[in-house]
Amino acid sequence: MQTNEGEVEEESSSQVEQEDFVMEGHGKTPPPGEESKQEKEQEREEQLMEDKKRKKEDKKKKEATQKVTEQKTKVPEVTKPSLSQPTAASPIGSSPSPPVNGGNNAKRVAVPNGQPPSAARYMPREVPPRFRCQQDHKVLLKRGQPPPPSCMLLGGGAGPPPCTAPGANPNNNAQVTGALLQSESGTAPESTLGGAAASNYANSTWGPGASSNSGASPNPIHIWDKVIVDGSDMEEWPCIASKDTESSSENTTDNNSASNPGSEKSSLPGSTTSNKGKGSQCQAASSGNECNLGVWKSDPKAKSVQPPNSTSDSNNGLGNWRSTSGQDRIGPGSGFSNFNPNSNPSAWPALVQEGTSRKGALETESSSSSAQVSTVGQASREQQSKMENAGVNFVVSGREQAQIHNTDGPKNGNTNSLNLSSPNPMENKGMPFGMGLGNTSRSTDAPSQSTGDRKTGSVGSWGAARGPSGTDTVSGQSNSGNNGNNGKDREDSWKGASVPKPTGSKSDSWDNNNRSTGGSWNFGPQDNNDNKWGEGNKMTSGVSQGEWKQPTGSDELKIGEWSGPNQPNSSTGAWDNQKGHPLPENQGNAQAPCWGRSSSSAGSEVGGQSTGSNHKAGSSDSHNSGRRSYRPTHPDCQAVLQTLLSRTDLDPRVLSNTGWGQTQIKQDTVWDIEEVPRPEGKSDKGTEGWESAATQTKNSGGWGDAPSQSNQMKSGWGELSASTEWKDPKSTGGWNDYKNNNSSNWGGGRADEKTPSSWNESSCKDQGWGGGRQPNQGWTSGKNGWGEEVDQVKNNNWESSANKPVSGWGEGGQNEIGTWGNGGNTNLASKGGWEDCKRSPAWNETGRQPNSWNKQHQQQQQPPPPQPEASGSWGGPPPPPQGNVRPSNSNWSSGPQPTTPKDDEPSGWEEPSPQSISRKMDIDDGTSAWGDPNSYNYKNVNLWDKNSQGGPAPREPNLPTPMTGKSASVWSKSTPPAPDNGTSAWGEPNESSPGWGEMDDAGASTTGWGNTPANAPNAMKPNSKSMQDGWGESDGPVTGARHPSWEEEDDGGVWNTAGSQGSTSSHNSASWGQGGKKQMKCSLKGGNNDSWMNPLAKQFSNMGLLSQTEDNPSSKMDLSVDKKFDVDKRTMNLGDFNDIMRKDRPGFRPPNSKDLGTTDSGPYFEKGGSHGLFGNSTAQSRGLHTPVQPLSSSPGLRAQVPPQFISPQVSASMLKQFPNSGLNPGLFNVGPQLSPQQIAMLSQLPQIPQFQLACQLLLQQQQQQQQLLQNQRKISQAVRQQQEQQLARMVSALQQQQQQQQQQQRQPSMKHSPSHPVGPKPHLDNMVPNALNVGLPDLPTKGPIPGYGSGFSSGGMDYGMVGGKEAGTESRFKQWTSMMEGLPSVATQEATMHKNGAIVAPGKTRGGSPYNQFDIIPGDTLGGHTGPAGDSWLPAKSPPTNKIGSKSSNASWPPEFQPGVPWKGIQNIDPESDPYVTPGSVLGGTTTSPIVDTDHQLLRDNTTGSNSSLNTSLPSPGAWPYSASDNSFTNVHSTSAKFPDYKSTWSPDPIGHNPTHLSNKMWKNHISSRNTTPLTRPPPGLTNPKPASPWSSTAPRSVRGWGTQDSRIASASTWSDGGSVRPSYWLVLHNLTPQIDGSTLRTICMQHGPLLTFHLNLTQGTALIRYSTKQEAAKAQTALHMCVLGNTTILAEFATEDEVSRFLAQAQPPTPAATPSAPATGWQSLETSQNQADPVGPALNLFGGSTGLGQWSSSAGGSSGADLAGTSLWGPPNYSSSLWGVPTVEDPHRMGSPAPLLPGDLLGGGSDSI
């Protein structure tokens, strides 16, 4: 007994360690006090423990040898591993053993050697060498502690004990365990059982696995083998073996735990069932569960005993789990394996993943069960994490709980399903898993159990929700069943599936499960819940499981998030790590840390692995399983990894992740795997991802997690939670809990988390979830979070509504969704819900646009960035839920269905800030969000930025998230308003409130924004259209053309591109683009151009160009190669760049802000980005300077403009480099024709740095252009051809270049260039000579430029040449300026431009960008000066003083930059004192956002005339062509006047960013002065049609949308802000009810000043008011905002011109074309007079102003006519409409068509129509 005592001690130590572990890793720990204690103890006892453990281990080894022969065999191995883990393992093992055996313990234990067999099987897949090491490492790291946790995982006790124990150990252990466990669990038997099982199992497999995974690593294999042998062990194993040999074994393998579980499970079931064999079989079926089972097997008995405990415990116990486990769980779970994995995702992915995870889980499970508690708990989190364990545990517990059959039995059928799996077990498992996983996550998730019950189903918490889904969760099977049940209720589905599932492959599993569902995820899908992933997968279906990743990838990103995509690997890994990691730690399950693990864990269970790390494995389902199906033996992790790595279909990103999951996660792999076969386990797992996630833990991490964490969440989902995790959170719900807490629930949490990231972080990110949900809608409607309210509400909502509503997210979710909904209760299910639902579509669906996450994401995607809400689309959509639209729903999957929940809405994910939310929701927040981002917490405003979020990036992940979070929320929120919220507009909002997301719906379009992208490329792709749509949603309206166009290009142009990477980048780009995501794919990846690229690459390679990526010159350039590359990267990945930019957003600074000028311009432009805002700006920002833009060869096109836009895209440094090379300008002629990918490739030709720069520039331009083109798909084909031709030209040029290069390089100017790039001056210098304008000019530098000049001349502008005049040698600036107006100011302008760096170029680019090809070409004059002009524009505005503020007046142009002379440019403007300063100028100008500056400059410049080019650019390259002509300039000038106003609008945007206030102030002043400028412009739209025309062009202007777009993007808030416009003459009152008396409202408004315009649109619930001064408007806004009038609370926001235009457009719902006129007219008068009267008017005019407005209007009308104006604004653009919108409509050709150019008429007439 000494040993026992020692064991006990060890166990205690283990526990302590575990706790410590928990504390450390999970945060979930016993009570805080305990935690502290544990910590202290840990420190104090660590050594002691280690020593004791060692001693004990030695003893145990001896005992083990003595005690159990089989075990003995196994023991040594175990022991060895255990050594690492040792004591812990042993004790647990030991303790658990007896309990396991309960009666049969000894025998059982022996049988559990079945476990060993399992283990043996597992081992291979479980521990790849690399992981092994890690595992070991971990163990070692932990030294004493980890082992204990491991042990705990394994058994709770020490690893050795297991050895020791099967026989004796069991007793001893039992005692010990009992003591420990009991204490902990309160169930000795369980503990023991768990231990035993764990022991055997764990020890064997787990032990080793866990333990070692490290120590056992090798052993594990042995063990595994043994296990397998044991598998033979008929008694227990037969079933399992047989059933599972595959199942079991596979499952087992799958689950590691599962397998083991299988055995164990058998036991479990057996125990429970009593019938080992039988149980076993069931288990086998379960197999996935198996783990559970296996574990349970032993456990079960104990469990049986425990059951109550379990139940209670479970609930409780589980709870305990939660409790114990919870804390312990964490500890242990994390305990060791997991922990390590967690900590060491990499380790775990493979190892843990499977093994550890599984094992741990199992063990844990066992333990859990047993100890469930402690051990388990202790065992850990890991175990728990394992989900399995948790699941299992839960299972057990749950099962027990339910007994689970029911438990999830609740699902009952589940049972059936499980049944097979021992229903219970399965169930358990599933459940547990669910629970565990989920629950676990829940922590206790027990919530399920514990939580309950609710959980019961909880189990799955997820479970529950998963509920049964939960079960599924884990098991998927059961879960499936359950889930199915749950969710589909269907146990059935699951169930059936389940059963088979267990064995089935993961995919299967899912499939099976889903089978019914059909879908793997389906499972989920099926259920929504399950959906879990599945669903989304739905399609993925089988894959689902595996899919996770896939979905992820595809779509889901989210999943991806989870799984791979997101982080992709990371995802899982991410989850794993990220989330999971923490999560796992937190949760045992979490472990799975990542998804992977999570999955793993969860997956493990069920394939958990699969998901989990496994993803690699396949489904995970076991790996094997996943890989499953057959594969009983899992392939070696290593092998799997290899496979994964070698897979071509995987997203490299996923694989590539280094961190986290490293590749390990294999999410992809797994996904890939899909294998279907066994539904098994995976099934439940189903979620594997979910599961894990669900499991939550991970999930939690994943979903859960986050929530749980929710709070924190930060981490990601899971991570944060981690402890919190579900569990912690107590989870309770994890979701719930989290929910609760978070309220946000996802949202909340997410929101909270902000992270959202987590999910999508990016997307989701809260986005989604959180915010998104927000609207709650959904999800949680319940306000609470998921849970809570959810429950009810949620439940209701979701469930209810959702629920069936399927609504739920799921839509599919059907219930699942319901689950979600249900989930409320089910919450879990819910989880699933989300998953499901969302997933359902979403996830996988990707497409689904449903938004799916992806969608959502997509939506969210960044564009949504804000999404969050949007992502929320979820949320948002939800709003739409309004019914709105399914889209919304769609979004949700319909989930929005929940729209219904609209009620819920309030809580909405977003909820976090209910108030806001509600407000938001209620109100038209779209705008509000926009306008008042502040109001909303949700970061909102920036929405964009937020979105940027970070992206989802998960990349950034989820960076976006943040935004998302709030933002998302915002979006979401906005969404809620659904009404149109501006978001709507966004969404257009489609219904959308979803806004972005909504879009989603749209078709998935969804996601318009990003969504698609989010979806990832996949989604994107498919979606892409959608996405595009998304934009448009509008897309729709807008056109698909446009969108598609946008999207279309794969690149999505910026969109995509940005999105692509940008997913994160998102931010804007991404966001917008998110689509960007696509980009990624597109971009370097080649996207669509890939094919050409390869040959091209080959050619270059042959030429020797390719290899020398970095050129000496480059090096020379002051830009370092790395930097250059970075730049390239950025440029390539617009998204990324964008991201950066976006982040800088405020400044709109490209990453290379330093290149202030350039950057500034870029960013601002970015805003304006001709591209569409979105793309363009993105591109721009991204590109920074993309003078190259001139890509487009046709000069007529707004080449001039685009360059401006482009310039910004390229970083100055890049430019610098570029010049070094002296490339042949001719190369750049490729300009627009080349695809970004091509360009990117070209840019890699090292020999010619300049070339590279040029390529980058071109790439950026093209991206922008492509976006535009995509908008106008028609063009794209031709463009593509052109690109190819140009590419060919470029190649030949390169060849020449190589020859010429050195000479050129020698040219001083060239060298000078580098300098230029750095500073605006250099740029200027270069520009002047090069006429590259802005950054680009630098590239060519004088020497090269001439070449360019010749080469570029018309097409040539290419670089930034913008053709400009092709002056070649003559300074572009000069040329441009002369062109502009021949005004001297031009020079200044150029200087300004230079100052801004590439700003001008960006401006050009921007303008031209969208239509880059058109514009780019020098747009001759325009083009030529475009860059500069653009840049200048900003500067131009400022007086000659060089202040940005200077008006466009010619005199104002900043001095031209002279290479040797410091450029005085526009620096140091005192916004306060400088009358010429405009907000934009200020922002863009010296300070922060060059972009802004640029914008302003553009605007001003417009005034100047020079600006006109910019203007055009901004407005629309289309205009440029005309604009290009002098007349255009003139027009521009006219426009200019408008521009300023416009600008003001923009300004606000910028203002929003940055110095918004300054800008505003400036604006105020400026505007006046600008107004003065009016001389240039006739009354805005009216007087000069031409100007209008530019705007007409405006389509581009639309782009101007930059404003919009950018604004939106840059700041949604900006818009919002901007919307608020900070000081804008226009106020948009939202949330008006039809009962409001217009006259009263008008009277109230008049109290603050004379109303130039009062446009009441009660149908939109909005009123557009224009004051004569911004001050009045500001005063009115302050007074009116949140003012309670009648039965509503008015939201007053400043409206930007764009918004106004939209508003008007909406107001006049005439056809878009017509609208413009109508609105235009309406506007016109409005605007006109206003314009004349007030600069703002003109600005409006600009925008709206005649053209602009009209356009906007129109677009708005079209797209968003309905949209709120303000919102609408956003919406409308939808870009499609408005922004792009109108043009959109014609966007595709808008450029080409003069119509846009149409003037002012626009207002009156129809710029749109024109």
Swiss-Prot record:
Gene3D superfamilies: 3.30.70.330
Annotated Basic and acidic residues bias: 34-52, 60-77, 123-139, 675-688
Residues modified to Phosphothreonine: 1426, 1441
Region of interest called PABPC1-interacting motif-2 (PAM2), as start-end residue ranges on this chain: 1449-1467
Region (Disordered): 1-221, 235-1080, 1141-1196, 1293-1329, 1568-1619, 1706-1740, 1786-1810
Keyword tRNA processing recorded: no
Domain of life the protein comes from: Eukaryota
Coiled coil: 33-75
InterPro entries: Argonaute_hook_dom (IPR019486), GW182_domain (IPR052068), Nucleotide-bd_a/b_plait_sf (IPR012677), RBD_domain_sf (IPR035979), TNRC6_PABC-bd (IPR032226), TNRC6B_RRM (IPR034925)
Gene Ontology terms, MF aspect: RNA binding
Cell location: Cytoplasm, P-body
Name recorded for this polypeptide: Trinucleotide repeat-containing gene 6B protein
High-level lineage: Eukaryota, Metazoa, Chordata, Craniata, Vertebrata
Gene of this entry: Tnrc6b
